[in-house]
UniProtKB/Swiss-Prot annotation:
<keyword id="KW-0560">Oxidoreductase</keyword>
<comment type="similarity">
    <text>Belongs to the iron/ascorbate-dependent oxidoreductase family.</text>
</comment>
<dbReference type="InterPro" id="IPR044861">
    <property type="entry name" value="IPNS-like_FE2OG_OXY"/>
</dbReference>
<dbReference type="InterPro" id="IPR026992">
    <property type="entry name" value="DIOX_N"/>
</dbReference>
<dbReference type="Pfam" id="PF14226">
    <property type="entry name" value="DIOX_N"/>
</dbReference>
<feature type="binding site">
    <location>
        <position position="279"/>
    </location>
    <ligand>
        <name>Fe cation</name>
    </ligand>
</feature>
<feature type="domain" description="Fe2OG dioxygenase">
    <location>
        <begin position="198"/>
        <end position="298"/>
    </location>
</feature>
<keyword id="KW-0284">Flavonoid biosynthesis</keyword>
<dbReference type="InterPro" id="IPR050295">
    <property type="entry name" value="Plant_2OG-oxidoreductases"/>
</dbReference>
<comment type="pathway">
    <text>Secondary metabolite biosynthesis; flavonoid biosynthesis.</text>
</comment>
<keyword id="KW-0847">Vitamin C</keyword>
<keyword id="KW-0408">Iron</keyword>
<dbReference type="GO" id="GO:0046872">
    <property type="term" value="F:metal ion binding"/>
</dbReference>
<feature type="binding site">
    <location>
        <position position="223"/>
    </location>
    <ligand>
        <name>Fe cation</name>
    </ligand>
</feature>
<comment type="function">
    <text>Catalyzes the formation of flavonols from dihydroflavonols. Acts on (2S)-naringenin and (+)-trans-dihydrokaempferol to produce kaempferol and on (2R)-naringenin to produce (-)-trans-dihydrokaempferol.</text>
</comment>
<protein>
    <recommendedName>
        <fullName>Flavonol synthase/flavanone 3-hydroxylase</fullName>
        <ecNumber>1.14.11.9</ecNumber>
        <ecNumber>1.14.20.6</ecNumber>
    </recommendedName>
</protein>
<dbReference type="InterPro" id="IPR027443">
    <property type="entry name" value="IPNS-like_sf"/>
</dbReference>
Length: 337
């Protein structure tokens, strides 16, 4: 069965002032109704490379942002601008390929994983859809990579993604260490609980084409990430929104920053000391928005739950311990955890 892609719908809708009904959100979700207008949220910005920030200071800044916000931006992160530019260039070129070429790596029908080119990710409540196409594939560790889900075109796609994966590892270690120390653990403990050297780096490219009615649609609906941590690179088109104090706010990107989301697994492992961020994405009438999140995930068979030394009689476990793959299944199918 042929799947209708949002990119194709966008092209057909260019001269219209309407979108298919399945993309129109309920009034309680519509950005025009629910966004706090005229206010842009300044989420914390943390300088990872500043000589003024001691390790102790960085730990404090990252831990506070993760407790209070669940989202922050990092600058001077050590990933070369060139590596990010190449990642973005090849991703954009993939989505500009003829449709039949993209379909070569489409998610197979009935496939239980998320890897591949696609449009639908999770159970759609009320038949409502997000205004986005995507491509998922693992970029690290090499033992977990399935190149069948990587594009052959553009020719430099593999090189750019592998270079970015290697460059990312220093930032990943720094974040896990700070988050561990920030709740009184040894610096290696949260990464070890997330899989250690088997930690999965799952890249997703989000492609949000122009939408004639951005006031009615959403790119990705409100959610928290399943991952431990998400490290995201956006293009220049704004669109990320965060839910804070019962309102939806636009988040302003800092040029050359990485956007860090605390995901469900860090909230679970920290037994609620850190908060996964509730967020969504809006779309643009005239411009294509793209983003490149990397979800840092435990291996599927790994048991994840609150770290035992954080559980006491006064602070009992707030979450179940279960295999990560079971957590993912429940989340994608909107089942209770």
């Amino acid at each position: 069965m042929e799947v209708e892609r949002v990119q194709a719908i966008s092209k057909m809708s260019r001269c219209m002032d309407t979108i298919p009904s399945e993309y129109i959100r309920s009034e309680s979700e519509q950005p025009a109704v629910t966004t706090m207008q005229g206010v842009v949220l300044q989420v914390p910005v943390i300088d990872l490379g500043s000589s003024n920030n001691t390790e102790e200071n960085l730990v404090e800044l990252i831990a506070e942002a993760s407790r209070e916000w669940g989202i922050f931006q990092v600058v001077n992160h050590g990933i070369p601008d060139d590596a990010i530019a190449k990642l973005q260039k090849v991703g954009k070129e993939f989505f500009e390929l003829p449709q039949q070429e993209k379909e070569v790596i489409a998610k197979p029908e009935g496939y239980q994983g998320v890897e591949g080119y696609g449009t639908k990710l999770q159970k759609e409540l009320g038949g409502k859809k997000g205004w986005v196409d995507h491509l998922f594939h693992i970029i690290w560790p090499k033992s977990a990579v399935n190149y069948n889900f990587w594009p052959n075109n553009p020719p430099l796609y593999r090189e750019a993604n592998e270079e970015y994966a290697v460059a990312l590892r220093g930032v990943v270690d720094k974040l896990f260490e700070a988050l561990s120390l920030g709740i009184g653990l040894e610096k290696h403990e949260l990464k070890k609980a997330s899989g250690g050297d088997d930690l999965i780096y799952m890249l997703k490219i989000n492609y949000y084409p122009p939408c004639p009615r951005p006031d009615l649609a959403l790119g990705v609906v409100a959610h928290t990430d399943m991952s431990a941590i998400t490290i995201l690179v956006p293009n220049e088109v704004q669109g990320l929104q965060v839910h804070k104090d019962d309102h939806w706010y636009d988040v302003k990107y800092i040029p050359n920053a990485l956007i860090i989301h605390i995901g469900d697994q860090i909230e679970i492992m920290s037994n609620g000391k850190y908060k996964s961020v509730y967020h969504r994405t809006t779309v643009n009438k005239d411009k294509t928005r793209m983003s490149w999140p990397v979800f840092l995930e435990p291996p599927p068979e790994l048991l994840t739950g609150p770290i035992s030394k954080l559980i006491t009689d006064e602070n009992p476990a707030k979450f179940k311990t279960k295999k990560y793959k079971d957590y993912v299944y429940c989340k994608l199918n909107k089942l209770p955890q």
